[in-house]
Regions:
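Acyl-donor (CoA/ACP) binding surface of acyl/acetyltransferases
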Residues: 1-17, 26, 64-155
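Short acidic-aromatic low-complexity motifs
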Residues: 15-18, 56-58
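Alpha-helical elements of Rossmann-like donor-binding domains used by nucleotide-donor carbohydrate transfer enzymes
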Residues: 19, 43-46, 50, 105, ...
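Conserved catalytic core of Hanks-type protein kinase domains
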Residues: 22-23
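Conserved GNAT-fold acetyl-CoA-binding loop/helix
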Residues: 28-50
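Sparse recognition of residues in long alpha-helices and their boundaries
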Residues: 36-37, 60, 154
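Alpha-helix initiation/capping motif
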Residues: 37-40, 54, 82, 127
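A short helix-loop-beta-strand connector motif used in the catalytic cores of GNAT acetyltransferases and
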Residues: 51-64
Length: 155
């Protein structure tokens, strides 16, 4: 568990099922998440069960962004590569909690975790040029564009 102010980023828990169902089935974020069809409660329950696998084995890890005990978003490490010491990062916040600084605090926590605990040297993210809020978020924490829609932060 990683914390700052009122924000905690923590692993998925079994009681996050309804939150995850709401988040993953929000069609407004499908264009940035790669989702093409709705998830069932059973699929997401299975996902939560298997999401507890170590990042070194699974190659990814999802954290829940928790505000005073309420799940408001997720922040993920994906495409984890131990040898290259890098990983992808993605963040999504429920609509009613956006533009309040929660994504920035969460991303800053995740970057610190990636540098200090996972010993990563690079994080990357794929961001659509139309996603101005995400561009501003990642730029504000030092990510730089390396290719069209690809942003990198080096340690």
């Amino acid at each position: 568990m990683l914390a700052t102010n009122d924000i905690i980023i923590r692993p998925l828990e079994n009681n996050d099922l309804e939150f995850l169902f709401l988040l993953e089935n929000d069609k407004s974020i499908w264009s940035v998440s790669g989702t093409t069809k709705p998830f069932s409660l059973e699929q997401l329950s299975n996902y939560i069960t298997h999401a507890k696998v170590d990042i070194a084995i699974a190659g990814q890890f999802r954290f829940v962004i928790d505000l005073n005990g309420k799940a408001i978003g997720c922040i993920d490490l994906y495409d984890y590569n131990f040898k290259k010491q890098n990983a992808g990062v993605g963040v999504v916040i429920l609509k009613q909690y956006r533009r309040k600084g929660f994504a920035k605090h969460s991303l800053a926590l995740l970057v610190k975790y990636a540098w200090e605990k996972l010993n990563l040297k690079q994080l990357h993210s794929i961001i659509l040029s139309s996603n101005k809020a995400s561009l501003a978020l990642f730029y504000s924490l030092g990510f730089e564009m390396t290719h069209k829609n690809n942003y990198v932060l080096n340690k």
